[in-house]
């Protein structure tokens, strides 16, 4: 039952979303910030454990703990139940973890990690191509039109696996002009992800294009930014071909989803372990 908790929309998702770490500050901060997405991992069953009809211990007076250990810290029956739940959840998440190590990207990309932010770097023919993405808020909601199970109701059918589809930024720098970078802000349209029947279709899209100075820590809003919503399709196709010639194509986008999903799952398990240690600590 426990692995399925990751596949049902969370009843208490809004509170857990606040626990997720904010993306580290970087020149890509604004472009990498995705639109708010509804949380998809359910901790809603957390308070509905077998045999419990209320949350004990929360109103007990602060002082020497009720268990009689004499530590003087606040740890309740609810905390113990929480730790037990997290232990079971961590165990089950490790069972369904597909990648014990992060998958490799083909095409000679080198991976650099900084918390939840990842960079893929590739040098080819006098150019440096950098792809940056952040796994925070990268899992889209999975709504199938069916009602959520009520408390105590078991989920019988296997739910779809969670997939991380982060926004990503492609930065191209030419060696003969290292002061200027062509920046393309890309994303995965939700209606295109997982559509295998249309082999010709692009599974990612370019949203914005701009030139930015490589020496600036923050990109300037005063630099002209081209929005592709009103762009001529011929120019847009050339931009997509420009990326494909540098290794950013559908194959790359598929592998990035696999890498991001593995990284997100890895960070999720680490978060559960940290949460367990925090609740358990005295």
Swiss-Prot record:
Region annotation Interaction with MAVS: where it falls in the sequence: 168-213
Family label: Belongs to the MAM33 family.
Subcellular location: Mitochondrion matrix; Nucleus; Nucleus, Nucleolus; Cell membrane
Annotated positions of the Phosphoserine modification: 87, 201, 205
Organelle transit peptide residues: 1-73
Disulfide bonds: none
Disease connection: Combined oxidative phosphorylation deficiency 33: An autosomal recessive disorder caused by multiple mitochondrial respiratory chain defects and impaired mitochondrial energy metabolism. Clinical manifestations are highly variable. Affected infants present with cardiomyopathy accompanied by multisystemic features involving liver, kidney, and brain. Death in infancy is observed in some patients. Children and adults present with myopathy and progressive external ophthalmoplegia.
Chain segments carrying region Disordered: 138-164
UniProt entry tagged with the keyword Mitochondrion: yes
Segments for region (C1q binding): 76-93
GO molecular function: adrenergic receptor binding; C5-methylcytidine-containing RNA reader activity; complement component C1q complex binding; deoxyribonuclease inhibitor activity; enzyme inhibitor activity; hyaluronic acid binding; kininogen binding; mitochondrial ribosome binding
GO biological process: apoptotic process; complement activation, classical pathway; cytosolic ribosome assembly; DNA damage response; immune response; innate immune response; mitochondrial RNA catabolic process; mRNA processing
Matches recorded under PANTHER family: COMPLEMENT COMPONENT 1, COMPLEMENT COMPONENT 1 Q SUBCOMPONENT-BINDING PROTEIN, MITOCHONDRIAL
Chain positions with Phosphothreonine modification: 214
Tissue: Expressed on cell surface of peripheral blood cells (at protein level); Surface expression is reported for macrophages and monocyte-derived dendritic cells.
Any one GO CC term of the record: membrane
Membrane topology, from the record: Peripheral membrane protein
Gene3D superfamilies: Mitochondrial glycoprotein
Principal localisation: mitochondrion
Record's note on what induces expression: Enhanced cell surface expression upon platelet and monocyte activation.
Protein name: Complement component 1 Q subcomponent-binding protein, mitochondrial
Organism of this sequence: Homo sapiens
Sites bearing N6-acetyllysine, chain numbering: 91
Lineage: Eukaryota, Metazoa, Chordata, Craniata, Vertebrata
């Amino acid at each position: 039952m426990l692995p399925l908790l990751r596949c049902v929309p969370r009843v208490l998702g809004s509170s857990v979303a606040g626990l997720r770490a904010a993306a580290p500050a970087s020149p890509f901060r604004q472009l990498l910030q995705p639109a708010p997405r509804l949380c998809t991992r359910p901790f809603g069953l957390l308070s509905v454990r077998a045999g419990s009809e209320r949350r004990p211990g929360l109103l007990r007076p602060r002082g020497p703990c009720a268990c009689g250990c004499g530590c003087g810290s606040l740890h309740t029956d609810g905390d113990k139940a929480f730790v037990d739940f997290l232990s079971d959840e961590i165990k089950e998440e490790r069972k369904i973890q597909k990648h014990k190590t992060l998958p490799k990207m083909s095409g000679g990309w080198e991976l650099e990690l900084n918390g939840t932010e990842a960079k893929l770097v590739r040098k080819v023919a006098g150019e440096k191509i950098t792809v940056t993405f952040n796994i925070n808020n990268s899992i889209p909601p999975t709504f199938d039109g069916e009602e959520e199970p009520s408390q105590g109701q078991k989920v019988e059918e296997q739910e779809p696996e969670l997939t991380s589809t982060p926004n990503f930024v492609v930065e191209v720098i030419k060696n003969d002009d290292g002061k200027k970078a062509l920046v393309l802000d890309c994303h995965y349209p939700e209606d295109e992800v997982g559509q295998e029947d249309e082999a010709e279709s692009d599974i990612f899209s370019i949203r914005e294009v701009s030139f930015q100075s490589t020496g600036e820590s923050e990109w300037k809003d005063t630099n002209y930014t081209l929005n592709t919503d009103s762009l001529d399709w011929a120019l847009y196709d050339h931009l997509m071909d420009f990326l494909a010639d540098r290794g950013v194509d559908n194959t790359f986008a598929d592998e990035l989803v696999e890498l991001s999903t593995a990284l997100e799952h890895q960070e999720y398990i680490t978060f559960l372990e940290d949460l367990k240690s925090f609740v358990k600590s005295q």
